[in-house]
Amino acid sequence: MHFRDNVILQAKNGPLDFQPREPYAPVFDQIKKTPLMAELQITQEYLGQSIHLTYLAPMWKEFFSFVSPQSLKGIAGVANIGDDTNWCGHHFSQANWYAFGRLAWNPDLTSEDIAKEWLLQTFAPEVLPSALDIMLRSHEACVDYMMPLGLHHIFMADHHYGPEPDGNQPHFPEEWKPVYYHKADSAGIGFDRSSKGTNAVSQYREPYCRDYDNLATCPEEYLLWFHHVPWTYKMKNGNTLWQEMQQHYNRGVSEVEDFVRIWHSLKPHVDEQRYREVDERLQKHLQNAREWRDVCLGYFGKLL
């Protein structure tokens, strides 16, 4: 296929669809002659929408650690603004719109740099240390209570909010079903994209092709993306896979519980309206995080 000289191909950052964590899309390795730009999702379609406090700059910086900004002609963002008075639904979701713009202008900025800038322009200086702590921990917390260790696509059908690990709607194509992606059974869990499975790993450049293909060298944050792993598999810290999954889900919920406590400590430094509106969302956030943990561990636990 030959494109005109003015064509720039736009590709999503990951191979699937803006999951809480994905490996980078190998299209950025394979397309060498046509200029590329990356598509990032500012709106939190799969990361709690406008309810969860999830700062996305760390996720985007993770992508840029694999795909150099210098190799791209630009980035596009799926915006998160709407008809809310605060534009983004959640006051802290404004930080994601801001972070996208700052990274588009200067991709060398750190997630912490950007969060500090935004906080100092948005809240009183006394809010900075504690709110910064929440923001920088929030993405990893989201991954933990939703889809840790490389799990993906286990959200509710249609609206993409909340967990549905048992999703197996007969009228949906296979590749729309959560059970197609986690492939959990009594033997283990995960999608085998190794050279012994679909061989999706072959699309990656070295050393990632080799590292992702080998169960022993595959980064644990992508483990279940690339491998179907026995429940009794020993992780690097000595836990079995099942123990590690439980630890991640519980840690994610504990993090959100801590976010609520931290926000409450900031009440003297935040105006009444914004304090109340953020707190209301944090309460729903915590409820949702517990639901994700309980539903997912309950479903997978029955398979062991």
Predicted regions and their residues:
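Catalytic-core regions of glycoside hydrolase
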Residues: 1-117, 122-123
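Catalytic domains of carbohydrate-active enzymes that cleave complex glycans
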Residues: 70-304
